[in-house]
Amino acid sequence: MNLKEKTRALFAEIFGYPATHTIQAPGRVNLIGEHTDYNDGFVLPCAIDYQTVISCAPRDDRTVRVIAADYDNQVDEFSLEAPIVTHDSQQWSNYVRGVVKHLQQRNNAFGGVDMVISGNVPQGAGLSSSASLEVAVGTVFQQLYHLPLDGAQIALNGQEAENQFVGCNCGIMDQLISALGKKDHALLIDCRTLGAKAVSMPKGVAVVIINSNFKRTLVGSEYNTRREQCETGARFFQQPALRDVSLEAFNAVASELDPVVAKRVRHVLSENARTVEAASALEKGDLQRMGQLMAESHASMRDDFEITVPQIDTLVDIVKATIGDQGGVRMTGGGFGGCVVALIPEDLVPAVQQAVAQQYEAKTGIKETFYVCKPSQGAGQC
């Protein structure tokens, strides 16, 4: 049974009437452009065929009832008439409540909803299960009540909910690609203007995601440290963000910066340039150049931004040794564990899967999880 059938069946069973709509919003993988989003830079993600699905119906009162199918059918119920506050014990509820609370501040022309939520975006892998949930919930209200909100506004609403209500600092990329993703394309997103350009993916190329299953621990504290270091760098150049600093300007004065801050800045500036070039390489179908850019990106994350771990570096090395110059591989996501992403010809997928299965666990003591994904459509009815 797929997620649509599962949530519709559960909806009818629990609420006693049929859902009127089913909405999906995908997870994402970032092909290149890491830790550039909060520096007003560029990112190149694609939506993947793992998503959050919500079967839903409007109510004729001001109550929101939510069932989380993946959490033993836990229930959350709250009123649109009272101030929406955080839930004491159910963390998933706060993503839903936060989205609804922030929607009220944007456009209050909606009533209650019944919904059943289920998803298959792997959690804790850095594939944006939370952004997928936020965008799905926003799209539910937008579709059921015909709210005049576009994908970018639904994405911003989700980001606000996560930053201010859930209390987790995140850039805009994850929500934006979930809302705006395009089938068979990646999206070059300008995180300052929120402009997005669809970039066609070469035919016969697989998007492979391998979860290291190394448990991320440092991610929150280290993420905030990196943000502060980047802000320090921008202040040094008297610019609003590192987006506004050129590599030439940086190289001229790099020795005057704190050495650690200098490394962080160099990563962001070089990664921005790589990301813009990667979009044109992909569009031309130049997988070889894309592979070089992904390798440079990984080295920069490892050596300058210092966010990789030995397990991730091992995975990258195994994949690289198998594919040579036919495609690319790098860590993707915030760092300190999580996943690597590889762009490889479809006919090389079995060899890569076999090499990783034979070597990764033997070297690290951890078993990986292997996903082959398709660049998919952003949020909407399904």
Curated annotation (Swiss-Prot):
ATP binds at residues 124-130. Substrate binds at residues 34-37, 223. It is an enzyme of class 2 (transferase). The active site is at residue 174. Belongs to the GHMP kinase family. GalK subfamily. Catalyzes the transfer of the gamma-phosphate of ATP to D-galactose to form alpha-D-galactose-1-phosphate (Gal-1-P). This is Galactokinase.
